[in-house]
Amino acid sequence: MASESLNRPLRVADFIATRTSDDDRGPAVFMHPDDARSRLLTDGELAWVYGPRRHELATVHIEPGIRPGDVTVRDITGIAPSEIVRVVKPDLDSRGRRPPTSYA
């Protein structure tokens, strides 16, 4: 229950679709500093963005101008404005689904 209060769902306020000719492109999530802090995320870090149809890794960008509880996503397939998403820091410390280090 404590983890649920730290990772509240976020509303997609805006969606940015880029073109191949754009310099700045690729999966990204823009969020308010308070929302990032509660998820232990920093600017430039990768995070999982879980949408209603799929999930994808995206670069986190911290933007003070975005309303708390809202996010703007860029180039994340399967997410549309007004949908609810969760942004989760990857768990790199647990051993789940990693290939074995020795085969002996």
Go through each PLM region and give its residues:
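Long, contiguous, secondary-structure-rich segments that constitute the structural scaffold
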Residues: 1-104
